């Protein structure tokens, strides 16, 4: 599981700059819950072969009682509760402030590792920085310059070194599919889960200290075994009531990472929101097989149905590989069809592709449409083989493959998916270029 790193500090100490540095300006997820004046931002970063989740909180005032600052503090408190590590950022130029001391007092009670990051410290003596901020009682200050990148790699190495390496979940002998049900609050996720598990199923409560952990629930349906990666904010015996569900972006992202197949639940009575699109985008980025269930279809008339289909086409057009179902989770209508698509998507995600057939498919694609030149060189693709599952990865070997345009990569992805009838899963292509060892030598 990716470690979650939360950035905390008073306003204008450089949290957003460090966030952009840690995520290399990749698109962030935003918790766009109504009424939030300033949203938390979520992004994925990578250093070497390690991935991590970064959360950028608004300027934090732990003693705020009302108004905007209180709302921002509430959001920061939620992020702190879900953190694996806290980066407490202070401003080396302006020095230690009473606001910093208030935040430090709160973080000492957080029960999480805290790293004291002194930003804007370029050109400053390390001993001077350490002397002033040691008084906070949070260990050795770590000088960085988020804007210039100085000290950031050392900071990441220190933080990530405290966590075990990422380990992909092993498939059991029966290759039981792991399913995550995700979506915004009140779209019908828990009702859908009840349709799968049955209302008398006992589901564990969140226990103290485990609020961040997704619960794995084995279940059987139509003679097939599955594991549900459950993230609902409320888990109880019998019906799960949507009205008190707590939405956690971090839990959602972790469930997606652990799953083989994700069921994205949408609400037919509401327009597709930015948050829906952000969640869908993360599913795609994670490479997970996907089934989309548009719930509450029985509650809307034909006019509304046509509008929502147009909205889906416009805002989720990047999910062309997924099957869409229009269901009523409350009545159980369409749930069986969703599970049939889950099975098909899982089979596609775990498919084994033969090297000869992959190479023939690639050669046919090249004959139909050659890759464009880059300068004086045209990419040469010699053979292809499978490099992994969940999602399927096709590795193409050749020469001058460093600058294949994205449009041509998409063309190859579509070609492979159509040739192998892969429905419900994205497909990734990786290039391996044979570099000339004599270049640059006399």
Curated annotation (Swiss-Prot):
* Superkingdom of the source species: Bacteria
Instruction: Give the binding site residues for GTP 2.
Output: 183-190, 230-234, 295-298
Q: Name one GO biological process term.
A: ribosome biogenesis
- Keyword Repeat appears in the UniProt entry: yes
Where GTP 1 is bound, by residue?
Answer: 9-16, 56-60, 119-122
Q: What this chain does, per the record?
A: GTPase that plays an essential role in the late steps of ribosome biogenesis.
- Family, as annotated: Belongs to the TRAFAC class TrmE-Era-EngA-EngB-Septin-like GTPase superfamily. EngA (Der) GTPase family.
Entries under HAMAP family matching the protein: GTPase_Der
EngA-type G domain span: 3-167, 177-350
Question: Which UniProt keywords are given for this protein, alphabetically ordered?
Answer: GTP-binding, Nucleotide-binding, Repeat, Ribosome biogenesis
GO molecular function: any one?
ribosome binding
Please give the name of this protein: GTPase Der
Its organism's taxonomic lineage begins at: Bacteria, Pseudomonadati, Pseudomonadota, Betaproteobacteria, Rhodocyclales
Coiled-coil boundaries: none
Q: Where is the KH-like domain?
A: 351-435
Q: How does it assemble?
A: Associates with the 50S ribosomal subunit.
